[in-house]
Amino acid sequence: MTYINSYKGQDWLLPTSIKQMISDKHICFFVEEFVDSLDFTNFDMIYEGAGHPAYHPRIIMKIIIQGMLSKERSSRKLSGACRENLVFIYLAEKVQPNFRTIARFRKNNGKFIKEVFKETVDLASDNGLVDLNMICTDGSKIKANSSKKMFLKKEQIERLDSIIDKMIEEDIKQDEIDKEIYGEKEENITDIEIKNLKGIVKSYREIKNKEKLKENCKRAVEEFDKDALIKRVSLSDPECRMMKNKKGVFELDYNTQFTVDSKNQIIVANDVCKDRTDTFQLQPQINNVRENITLNEDTKIVADCNYNNGENLKFLEEEKLNGYIPTISQAQKLDDKKQKKEDDYEYDWDKDEIILDGTRLKFHALWKHRGNKRQRWYKSEDGRIVRRVPEFFRERLRMKKKLETKEGKKIYSLRKTIVEPVIGNIKYNLGFTEFLVRGLDGAKLELNIASISHNLKKIWVARGRIGKNNEVIVFDLIIKNNQMNCDPTCKNKLLTNIPFFMHKQIKHYL
């Protein structure tokens, strides 16, 4: 057996192109093409004027997106990849941005990154990958960048705040003492030696950014004022909350929300919230979808039982949206789980009466019971039997009836194959199981980057499927072009009817 010849010297007569060393089927070329099509003119005003030239935001954006696709999210790892990884060297155009540059760009451009996510939705829609026949919403908890050791009560934080004040006072006094000690210059000690001496003394002290810690204490106390239900707050990230994940483990998390189109699993809306449940997230998600893309009149909106809230169902009916959200017992039945006990009454829609064990109860009043949400009170004629039901129980009954039909069951069963695989892809294929940036705004920013990467990969895969029929498409275009007598304006009109990623391949035929 002989071995393949290798070349340890690795010398080339002529330097090879980095692009040629990457597979022509690599997704990085699609990332490059997409980012190059974005508008970066707003950054020109930021970077204009005197000073050291800045890295073009186009380059940093390519690095961040490719990093998410390659499961490399840390700014330090991305900076290292720009020196060691051929794909990143190619996308970085042979420059090597510092990790601080990457982290600073990511931190300071949340609005721009959100607009880029909208661009991916528009791109998918323009290429026929989104039809909005059905959208599915679901939530998933993702671990925050915070430690349980810093999860403190309000009294503990206030006590810590007072301790920090004393430490700052001591530091001020120590600085005055240092000035007296180091200010008296001796003949045998030079300025450099005094500077070294200061460093030695400083190394023996406990070094902490007390001002930053004090600011965190202030933010943590503000969170108690915003949310009266919480008893503890994380000092390192006051906006995250203690939540129970699917494994039954309590950890500091953020609740992420995804709304996915059924045709190609394109994410059309996302969000991050501090709520422990998904109950109040349906309306914000639908509003987010409307900001990104226009909903059809007959769009089916599917969500699990966690979104079955009276206000949500009322909202769907008022907006004339076709919702499919089961009750807890219906969801358990569809999932072959032990069912929760159902209500034991019937409802007469014509007379607005409840039938309980053969006795008819008439509507009496709409009241609040012990400070809870408003309830509808039904009472028998003799006043001996009273039944309280939720204010929007009729909307619940209509939704329940819809989910009991054969069509309703079939539509709801598709939810698992639409939105849940998307969450699984983001968490496990992209490695997005924990936030790196702290704060709610930082979490939203990171989720947008993950959604951009997911959508681009879906479009790239669809590009491969379209590519199988390219010969037929090109043949049809040549015929149309000949019929147009090669008029340049007609060529442009022709190109607008096909996906942008096929333009380069087709232009040389026209």
Give short role names for the model-derived ranges.
Residues M1-F29:
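Hydrophobic alpha-helical membrane-insertion signals
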Residues D36-D44, L69-R73, E84-L91:
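Short helix-loop boundary/capping segments at the starts of domains
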Residues D24-I65:
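Basic, short loop/linker segments at the boundary and entry of helix-turn-helix/winged-helix-like folds
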Residues I4-K8, H52-A54, I89-Y90:
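A short, ordered amphipathic alpha-helix with a cationic face
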Residues Y3-S6, I64, K71-E84, V95-L510:
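Anion-binding and metal-coordination hotspots
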Residues K19, S23, L69-S70, K94:
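Amphipathic alpha-helical interaction elements
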